[in-house]
């Protein structure tokens, strides 16, 4: 019921925060070290702090500016080629997060990367036709779904900071997970070292992790809005990259 309630709140037509993805352990209880002593109903100070990281920092500025609730946009895309990339930096400190986007192409190569700490980079690559996550710390997660068939595929990387877990999904299929705690900075979509062409659509960045049920709904085309900082439909016919999420953050083409 907790997961069902979380999904319901996602689709309410008002701003919301995905608290479940902040400090849940995946089974409806607090992650280890975040419970308030023997009080099973409340988190401790660190737990409340994790809640704040799941809030979009500029949400109220966006509301004050008249920015409304986003809706899903289908049928648009953006081709990245000749070393062009899309770049955004999350507002303020990030702990839990989910990065999700659609890709279509026929070649291997880097599809996204992010800064972690001061001098490490995490990458999402297509290797031998499948998506592979290379951790900025150690290890990798390798998918099993072929994504070089020139069809649309959804790639989702989700990180539970409190649990210390990163999970990779290709479409609705869980590729695997790593035990790690990330402190992410700038995100880059595409590969600024390659001239190869790849098509992208619907870029999402959430300030909260997502479970299997949420990933399924996202792949089904539902508009999940809780803790959403970036939603860029990506439309190559427009001169700028629009962010429809209720935040003041932006995505830049470089």
Describe each region flagged by the PLM.
Residues 98-105, 194-222, 229-238, 247:
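Extracellular, beta-strand-rich glycan-interacting domains
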Residues 10-11, 92-94, 125, 181-182, ...:
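Extracellular/periplasmic catalytic domains that process cell-envelope and extracellular macromolecules
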Residues 23, 63-83, 117, 216-254:
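Extracytoplasmic low-complexity segments
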Residues 73-75, 79-132, 164-165, 208-215, ...:
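Extracellular glycan-recognition modules
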Residues 114-121, 170-174, 222-223:
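Short edge-strand/loop segments of extracellular domains
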Residues 174-200, 224-229:
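Flexible glycan-contacting loops in extracellular carbohydrate-active proteins
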Residues 70-79, 100-107, 123-181, 254:
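Extracellular glycan-interaction surfaces
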Residues 1-70:
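Catalytic His-Asp segment of secreted/periplasmic serine-dependent ester chemistry enzymes
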């Amino acid at each position: 019921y907790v997961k069902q309630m979380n999904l319901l709140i996602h689709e309410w037509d008002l701003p919301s925060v995905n608290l479940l993805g902040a400090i849940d352990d995946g089974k409806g209880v607090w992650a280890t070290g975040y419970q308030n002593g023997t009080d099973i109903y409340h988190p401790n100070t660190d737990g409340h702090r994790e809640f704040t990281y799941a809030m979009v920092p500029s949400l109220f500025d966006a509301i004050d500016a008249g920015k409304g609730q986003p809706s899903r946009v289908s049928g648009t895309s953006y081709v990245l080629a000749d070393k062009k990339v899309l770049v955004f930096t999350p507002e303020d400190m990030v702990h839990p997060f989910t990065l999700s986007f659609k890709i279509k192409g026929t070649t291997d190569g880097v599809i996204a990367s992010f800064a972690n700490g001061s001098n490490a980079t995490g990458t999402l690559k297509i290797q031998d036709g499948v998506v592979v996550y290379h951790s900025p710390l150690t290890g990798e997660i390798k998918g099993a779904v072929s994504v070089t068939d020139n069809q649309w595929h959804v790639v989702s990387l989700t990180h539970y900071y409190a649990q210390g877990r990163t999970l990779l999904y290709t479409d609705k299929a869980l590729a695997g997970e790593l035990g790690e705690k990330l402190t992410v900075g700038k995100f880059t979509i595409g590969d600024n070292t390659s001239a190869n062409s790849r098509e992208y659509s619907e870029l999402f960045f959430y300030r909260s992790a997502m479970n299997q049920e949420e990933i399924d709904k996202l792949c089904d085309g539902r508009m999940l809005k809780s803790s959403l900082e970036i939603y860029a439909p990506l439309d190559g016919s427009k001169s700028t990259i629009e962010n429809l999420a209720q935040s003041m953050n932006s995505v830049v083409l470089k």
